[in-house]
Amino acid sequence: MLAGAIEYLHRRQSLPAWTPSRLALYYDGRARDFAEARDAGATLVDVCNGACEHGYADEALWPYDVAAFAEPPTIAYRLAANRQRLANFEVLAHDLATIEFELAAGNPVAVGVEVYRAFEDAPEGRVPLPARGDLHVGGHALLLVGYDAARGTFLARNSWGAAWGREGYGVLPFEYVLDPALCGEIVTVRAVRALDVPRG
């Protein structure tokens, strides 16, 4: 979900609009744990640190192909990635007021959540709290982009495409994110740093 956050920050900072390579972000995140050869996931903090250290570039230079997850990005990609880096991110506590503050300030918030079968089958993207006996599927990252205090829900962008939820967006209860057993990581990204990229 860091790619979606970077896309948003580029628009907010009036930088050229393109999609960062998700495969390269994932590779650099796994490299933090010397796990490039394993498709075992990566923490949000590792992916953010990778984008701070190595930068990122257009997905056109390193397209998403899950079969190529263990291949290092090309030299051409690395040269392009040197031109912009993630500049600022912060790990947040499981605190509603803090998360609401970041979202109200226009800062996207990425969360790493535990996914259950009901999440995959959520009608119109309305994600329920898991019930006793629900099948655990694994971990997954979402990008929180808003909240509804009256309904007690976050608006989240998923990475599964427009077929999930409402055009790729869904809502989940505050409790889903605030429970450390259901949400392991909460990270906000506030800025990217362009070194010599012309402004759009």
Residue ranges and their predicted role:
Residues 1-8, 30-157, 162-200:
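Predominantly the structural core of cysteine protease catalytic domains
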Residues 7-25:
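Phosphate-handling active-site elements
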